[in-house]
Amino acid sequence: MKILHICSEMYPLIKTGGLADVMGALPYAQQSAGNDVRVLIPYYPQVASKLGETVEVATVGTFAGVVTVRFAYLNGLGVYVIDAPHLFDRRLPYYDDNYQDYTDNYKRFALLGYLGAQLASGLDHWWGRSDVLHAHDWQAGLACAYLKSWNSPVKSVFTIHNIAYPGRFQAYHLAELALPWEFFHVNGLEFYGEISYLKAGLFYADRVTAVSPTYAREITEQIAGAGMHGLLQQRLAEGALRGILNGVDDTVWNPETDTNIVANYRPNYMQGKGKNKSELQRYFGLPEDKDALLFVMVTRLTEQKGADFLLARIDQIMQHNVQLVVLGSGSPDLEWALRDAQSRYPHKIGLKIGYDEALSHQIIAGGDVILVPSRFEPCGLTQLYGLKYGTLPLVRRTGGLADTVNDAHKESIENRTATGFVFSYPDADNFYDAVLRAINLWGKNKLWSSVRQNALAQDFGWAKVAQQYQELYYEIV
C-alpha cells in the first residue's frame, strides 16, 4: 500500500513536540511491514542542514508563489520537502522569538496541505498516486479539504495529536487558498466565523483518529472537545473516529542501547540506572545521594502540562528527602517561578530552561519518578519513555496517560499490574497526594523494585501501532 504522511515536523529533522517523535517512527514501522511510505514536510533550515542532498521533483506555481518540491532519503525512508524560502526559511517553525505566531501561517500550512494533496494525487510521476494520504494535526488539515474539492479518489486519514490547537484564521483568507467558497460552511471549514484547518481534517477526512482511546472519547465531550465535540460525536456515530495509542521508537528510546546516557542497563541488570542517577545529580550540582527520591520533568511549560501543580506544593515537597530536575521552556511566568524555586532550594532542584534532546534522555534514565501531571494529554510520550527506562510515571488520569499507566496501590502491587502513580482531579492537592504515595513507596525497596519491573515489562512498540493503522486504511481503500 502507498501511504503519504503530511506533517509539520519529524524527528530527527526538526522537533518541537511529540508529533515529531511519532513522525520519526510510524512511517518506518509501516515501511517495515511492507508498505511504500513517504513523508512530506516543509524545508525548514534545520531540515535542510540534516537531510543532505535532495533532488527536484517538481516546480509548481501555487497561490503561495512558485515553489519546488524536493526529495531525499532519510535512513531509507522517502521524504519530500517544500522548498519555499519566502515561507519556511525561518529559525523557528511556527512563531518568532517573541512567541508570536507568524502572520502568514495561514498560507504556509495551506501550502503544506495543498502540495500534500497534489503529491498524493500523482505530482511525482515516478512514485504515482498514493492509496492513502495521512495528515497530522491542524498544519496538515487542509490536505483533506483539497482532496475533496478535487473529487480525488485518494482516501484520507486525519490524526488529532492535540485538539487544543485548531489552526484558526480569518475567513477572508479562504479567497487566497484555491478552495471553493461553499466550503466556508458549518459543514465544512467554518468555525465561529473563521476557518479552522483542524476542522478541515475532522470534517473532510475519510477516517479520523486520536492518539489514544481515552482521548478519542474525551474529545466527543464539551469539556475536552475544544468546540469540535459536536462534529466529533457525528464522526463517531458514522464509525469514522477511533483512538490508536502512540508507540515508543525502540531505536531511539532504549536504555540497553541509548548513546545519550552514561550507562546502559536492562530489566535484569539495573546497576546502570544508579550510575545515570549519579551523573544527573553531578550535572545539575545536586548532592550525589542515592537515597533521595529524584523526581524529573521534561515538558513544555504551559498550563496544559500542570507544572503549576508542582509549583503550588514545591515547599511541602522539598521538606522530604527528594530532589527535582526540570527541563523545559514556555510560559515566562512558569519559567520565572521555577527559577525562583531553584534559587530557594539550590541543593535540591536542578533546572534547565530550554530543550536539549540528549539531556532529556539522561534525565529520564537518571530519574526515579517522571512527572506528567497534565490537565489533558492526548497521548503523552514522556510517560512511555519513563516506563521504558524504569522511571515510574506520576500522571493525571486523562487521555493517553490513563491508557498507559496503572496506579500503584495494595491490590495492583500484589497482582503485579502497578506501573506508576495516578491522580484523578486536576489540582495541586491531588497531585501532592500522589507525590506522597510515591515517597512512601520509595521507602519500601522490594515493592518499588517490583513496580519498576512491571513498568519495564510494558510493550509500546510501533509494530503493533502500525498494524492498527493498516487495518484502518483497509476500511477505506
UniProtKB/Swiss-Prot annotation:
Tagged with keyword ATP-binding: no
Gene Ontology biological process terms, A to Z: glycogen biosynthetic process
Leader sequence residues: none
Coiled coil feature spans: none
Catalysis performed (reactions): [(1->4)-alpha-D-glucosyl](n) + ADP-alpha-D-glucose = [(1->4)-alpha-D-glucosyl](n+1) + ADP + H(+)
CDD domains linked to this entry: GT5_Glycogen_synthase_DULL1-like
Pathway: Glycan biosynthesis; glycogen biosynthesis
Record's function text: Synthesizes alpha-1,4-glucan chains using ADP-glucose.
Protein name: Glycogen synthase
Annotated gene: glgA
